[in-house]
Amino acid sequence: MIETTTLRFSHGDTTVLDGVDFTAETGDVTVLFGRNGAGKSTLLRHFNGLLEPDAGTVSVGGTPIAYDDDSLTELRLRVGLIFQNPDDQLVAPTVQQDIAFGPRNAGIEDTDRIEDVVSTFDLSEQAERLCNTLSGGEKKRVSLAGVLAMDPEYVLLDEPTAGLDGAGCRTIVEFVSSLAADGITTVIATHDVGFGLTVADTVTVLEDGVIDYRGDTLSQSLAAEYDLRSYVFDDWSDVSVE
């Protein structure tokens, strides 16, 4: 479980999160909706200690986050974060090196797992390619593979479908479905309501730094009130809506 209690965070004079009480149940896919600037990405970055709150607590697995270097290193082995821009994720020259970077940096030498992850994301033929020669969709797959190679307990995704076409978005849906099948607690920040409702077990809407709605689905009329749109999956026939 990931949980926050009266979480507050400001950037300069601007209050970004204002007393947020949030829960992501163990094994669930929790989708965090909100328009641009609502505070979604800021909240997500608190879950693996990239940001420290001004007030309130963040707990992962029932334990409040400690912000010393050793504790944060251990936390980030358990909680993988996939950034919106895959270029922020890629840290090594080639595909294979990038996917293996996280485990090796943590002292984990598991060649079989790395090879399995490379194969899972259909990257075997591109393993020696330079990351800076990849397309946006290919970079996204490498960033997903790099996080999965860490064998995390929790996965956080920030706007994972941004800039992707339909095929790329389906890759993300399949990835999230595989996380759910493996019982990995997943939190996704997005303003793409079609994608979000396709994968969500539970839904939270963040509005102006506060949680404005919780539920297991979201009606189209309510989505419109929050200015949420479906950018790729125009047909909602397979999506549970009220």
Swiss-Prot record:
The keyword Coiled coil does not apply. GO terms for cellular component: ATP-binding cassette (ABC) transporter complex. ATP binds at G34, R35, N36, G37, A38, G39, K40, S41. It comes from the Archaea. GO terms for biological process: cobalt ion transport. It is a peripheral membrane protein. It is an enzyme of class 7 (translocase). It comes from Halobacterium salinarum (strain ATCC 700922 / JCM 11081 / NRC-1) (Halobacterium halobium). Probably part of an ABC transporter complex. Responsible for energy coupling to the transport system. GO terms for molecular function: ATP binding; ATP hydrolysis activity; ATPase-coupled transmembrane transporter activity. InterPro entries: AAA+_ATPase (IPR003593), ABC_transporter-like_ATP-bd (IPR003439), ABC_transporter-like_CS (IPR017871), ABC_transpr_CbiO/EcfA_su (IPR015856), Co_trans_ATP-bd (IPR005876), ECF_ABC_transporter_ATP-bd (IPR050095), P-loop_NTPase (IPR027417). This is Putative ABC transporter ATP-binding protein VNG_1631G. SUPFAM superfamilies: P-loop containing nucleoside triphosphate hydrolases. It is found in: Cell membrane. Its EC number is 7.-.-.-.
